[in-house]
């Protein structure tokens, strides 16, 4: 499973002119299920995201996670957006191939599982809309952008 995290001051997802998900300070999580992924990869990816220390402490060092933005338990938001294009392979030319992405039904199942687990473990979760044409608006904080990959064999 792959994800790209963007530390944001705020972010929102718009579908057909309507905002479907919105957060303040937190993480925009673009996520992609790959062929061979299962719940184990989703669990490992989510655990890493929730514990990743990419928010600044009082000294300006990246020592805080989305679960503890201020050292006193303030939690940031997660805006989770499905993005199968993270599985793009351009090694064979200039047109991306997406054969490494999970099949649409399996991708939706794993995305839904990932979101359900996030909702169970974190109080501030919003989402995009699976397989929709989305406009993602964000104010990148830093900028800080982190790619993550949990191997399907993991």
From Swiss-Prot:
Main location: cytoplasm
Listed GO CC annotations: cytoplasm
Annotated motif Gly-cisPro motif, important for rejection of L-amino acids, positions: 142-143
Xref: Pfam families: Tyr_Deacylase
Localization, UniProt: Cytoplasm
Entry keywords, A to Z: Cytoplasm, Hydrolase, RNA-binding, tRNA-binding
Domain comment (free text): A Gly-cisPro motif from one monomer fits into the active site of the other monomer to allow specific chiral rejection of L-amino acids.
HAMAP family from the UniProt entry: Deacylase_Dtd
Family membership: Belongs to the DTD family.
Name used for this protein in its record: D-aminoacyl-tRNA deacylase
Protein species of origin: Polaromonas sp. (strain JS666 / ATCC BAA-500)
């Amino acid at each position: 499973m792959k994800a790209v995290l963007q530390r944001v001051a705020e972010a929102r997802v718009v579908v057909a002119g309507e905002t479907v998900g919105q957060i303040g300070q937190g993480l925009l999580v673009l996520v992609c299920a790959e062929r061979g992924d299962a719940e184990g990869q989703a669990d490992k990816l989510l655990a890493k995201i929730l514990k990743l220390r990419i928010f600044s402490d009082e000294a300006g060092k990246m020592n805080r996670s989305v679960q503890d933005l201020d050292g006193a338990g303030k939690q940031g938001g997660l805006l989770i957006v499905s993005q199968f294009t993270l599985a793009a392979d351009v090694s064979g030319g200039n047109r991306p191939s997406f054969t490494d992405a999970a099949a649409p039904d399996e991708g939706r199942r794993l995305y839904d599982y990932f979101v359900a687990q996030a909702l169970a473990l974190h109080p501030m979760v919003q989402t995009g809309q699976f397989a929709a044409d989305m406009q993602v608006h964000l104010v990148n904080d830093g900028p800080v952008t982190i790619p993550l990959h949990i191997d399907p064999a993991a």
